[in-house]
Amino acid sequence: MHAAACFVRPAPEKREELLQTLRSLAVAIRADPGCLVCAVCLEETSTFFIVVSGWASDADLRGHLRSEHFRVLSGASRLLGASAEVRFLASHPPSESPVSVPT
C-alpha cells in the first residue's frame, strides 16, 4: 500500500468548519480510482487533524496528488486559516521511487 498523511492545524475558531470540510472531502476521495482508505483522524485534546489515505499503487497516489480533491484539501486548509504538511508513509516493501508533492 502507498500512503500519505496530511497534517492540518486549523485556526481555533475554524476547527469545526474545517473538520466538516475534511470529512466531506474524505467521502469523495474514497471513490477515487485506487483509493483503499481515506480517514480523518483527530485527537480531542489536540488542535490538529490528520487525513490519512492509502492507495493501491504508486501511480494511484501520484494521481491523487494531482487531483482536484487534493487541490481542494490544500485550498480549504489555507482558506480556513490552517497550516498543512504532507508526509508519505513507508509501504512494505518501500516503493522504488520517492513521491514528490507538486508545489
Where are these regions (language model features)?
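Short S/T/G/P-rich N-terminal loop/turn motif that feeds into the first structured element of a domain
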Residues: 1-49, 56-68, 77-78, 82-103
